[in-house]
């Protein structure tokens, strides 16, 4: 409980990071931030072993060996002994947070949010805790929006700081803005198993001292998001936690964790999942006496509707400790320099029996008057806010390619260690039938017309399911069906399926997505060329930090799919008729196809290189191979000017059917031309764009690029034809102007063909060059 002067509750760092990741999809982590840890029925508090202090009915398999049993019992007893004999310390604290937007629907990741903070902090075991802020910077790079401070700093949440994470008397295990059940809680044995791990001895030659660190591996009894798998390292002499690497036992699934709320969320953003890759923290051995906070890092990814993903990272570092020295940070209200701000927050906190501040899993509660309490003040001191943005103490943003708190080798090792810990099979939701305006179930194109479908999903594991999808289009009346068994996580997928479906040529864009459906109806422009396929496939995909790949093995029969409708808004005015579809050749083939996407960075203030390599090889009625490469470069200039260049080329070997040639035309290749206006065994394309950016808010002092929207001028040139005639004869070109929102996430272009045609086109599409 808290009393004293009012205080906003500062969210835990992970919760803040996750919440910030939802700027473009608010429902992604909202349920996660709101979930409460379930409390089991209260047990008899007197039923404890007099020797161990643990409940008599603790499961026999709680400890795999006597060594880990003794270690965990001692660690539980010594949880609050970390600060024993420590009067005070000062330390420099730095924080970095990053949230991005990527996924299968975009060519490269965009930086959605970042925050960097630096402060000098004073902790006192009996007196005030002091935070002198050194620097603060945060913004939304995708929109070019930087830090804007409140007129009154004490009301600005950018200065919120949860001191419990910095308190050496704490060893918090956190998840979202709720605590996961701590593996050292009195009741933890009902929910975790423990076994001994590795041993590490560190010798401090100058002090002639050796410290032995021992590992306890934590396995959850239940496959729940608020249970952890963990590798905990303790100082063997003191049984103090000195390093931890852990993650939730399973992925977060919105439908499973919050079924009632999930029913109220629009279907087009489902499923909503989140995977925490790791949470890791360690302590430094200050003056070879006290284990005090050193580093902390978090990495997670959320996915929306299996198309968009939102990576979230944050890290803390603690440097330049000064132990048991008089405080130097607070000059007092009267001596405060001009332009500085000082305020005081007063907290009285009573901890529950688990030491978790009232949000733990508490089967054995204690009376409040038997628990430790604290009555402390937190003093915040803020210099003039204009000086905070460019403070030299600020770390570089996480997306700037600077050195991280933990190097790649350390993170790879802890991922591997966590991946070896057993997790029980989770409780599965029942099968469900999905229909209506959901991703992949409702669409419109000139072949099917209005095509609607229904999907039956039967979960078979934590991330696996069996799916049956059926659909039919009007006026085509051609049925389609897919049966798939798929394993899908926040970072990848693997599956097998059989199908009879309409597909697009697959080289550029997403013609069967929602965007092209709306575009077809409103503008009379269908960006797709389609054919029908029936077959079987084995598919896999994975998304990494700066790359992603997809691979498919297939055997199928391909056939033509003629146009069946002209309905669109311009058609109702008699101004435009949808063009015919490509005439696909019928044949049976088997082969492999793949796609690799890469990009160099996400900072809109730096040049960004992105590229896609894709190919296919097949044999059967047609024997052929395809290979193509497209590369783009975006270069920022002063005054929010940006230049983007793209070049691509590809060729086909052997004897492909018509539908496996390259077909140019449309917003991603050659604007102002119909899809398929140029087609052949080989192609090249070159595109250039020059944009002037504008921001909706002042960015004084914000040194990171980005624009809320841009006005863009562009030109496209391309050629497609016979491979032996590769060159410029018959090349086509267009010029135009457009409007870009949020770094090209949404584009509106008007293009005019200037070579090889004279048409005008309006293009509305997603994921432009800039």
What are these regions (language model features)?
Residues 35-229, 250-258, 275, 300-436, ...:
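Structured extracytoplasmic
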Residues 94-96, 123, 298-299, 457, ...:
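Outer-membrane beta-barrel pore domains and translocons
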Residues 146-172, 416-424, 440-442, 494-541, ...:
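C-terminal outer-membrane beta-barrel translocator/porin domains of Gram-negative envelope proteins
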Residues 594, 737-745, 758-770:
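Outer-membrane beta-barrel "beta-signal"
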Residues 1-15:
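N-terminal secretory signal peptides that target proteins for export/translocation
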Residues 75, 230, 236, 278-287:
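Extended lipid/amphipathic-ligand handling interfaces
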Residues 17-30:
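Bacterial N-terminal signal peptides
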Residues 70-77, 351-473, 479-481, 498-500, ...:
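Outer-membrane beta-barrel initiation region
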